[in-house]
UniProtKB/Swiss-Prot annotation:
<comment type="function">
    <text>Involved in the modulation of the specificity of the ClpAP-mediated ATP-dependent protein degradation.</text>
</comment>
<protein>
    <recommendedName>
        <fullName>ATP-dependent Clp protease adapter protein ClpS 2</fullName>
    </recommendedName>
</protein>
<dbReference type="InterPro" id="IPR003769">
    <property type="entry name" value="ClpS_core"/>
</dbReference>
<comment type="similarity">
    <text>Belongs to the ClpS family.</text>
</comment>
<feature type="compositionally biased region" description="Polar residues">
    <location>
        <begin position="8"/>
        <end position="19"/>
    </location>
</feature>
<comment type="subunit">
    <text>Binds to the N-terminal domain of the chaperone ClpA.</text>
</comment>
<dbReference type="InterPro" id="IPR022935">
    <property type="entry name" value="ClpS"/>
</dbReference>
<dbReference type="Pfam" id="PF02617">
    <property type="entry name" value="ClpS"/>
</dbReference>
<dbReference type="GO" id="GO:0030163">
    <property type="term" value="P:protein catabolic process"/>
</dbReference>
<dbReference type="GO" id="GO:0006508">
    <property type="term" value="P:proteolysis"/>
</dbReference>
<feature type="region of interest" description="Disordered">
    <location>
        <begin position="1"/>
        <end position="24"/>
    </location>
</feature>
<dbReference type="InterPro" id="IPR014719">
    <property type="entry name" value="Ribosomal_bL12_C/ClpS-like"/>
</dbReference>
Amino acid sequence: MSNDENRSGSPTGPNTSVITKVKPKTKRPNLYRVLILNDDYTPMEFVVHVLEKFFQKDVEAATKIMLHVHHHGIGECGVFTYEIAETKVTQVMDFARKHQHPLQCVMEKK
């Protein structure tokens, strides 16, 4: 091999480098289910109102969830990232306390 070939940067020469692009993988955030628990004291209409106000459910969807809670003891209001789920639970609990209802709202990892 002559000196000219080494200076030209041939693919097998010492000046060869490989550039690779690494695309970082973005991890999806964990999701949490927001659940309402049944009790014997909170009026059904109040539960429907909570679902409309805090979870943007229409009357039909809110009523369906409320009846599920009434018959099964628990019902899912929505699935959110941690911060949003935590905020929703706090809002519902504060609203229920303000209106003197024992309604319970919890979150669990999906």
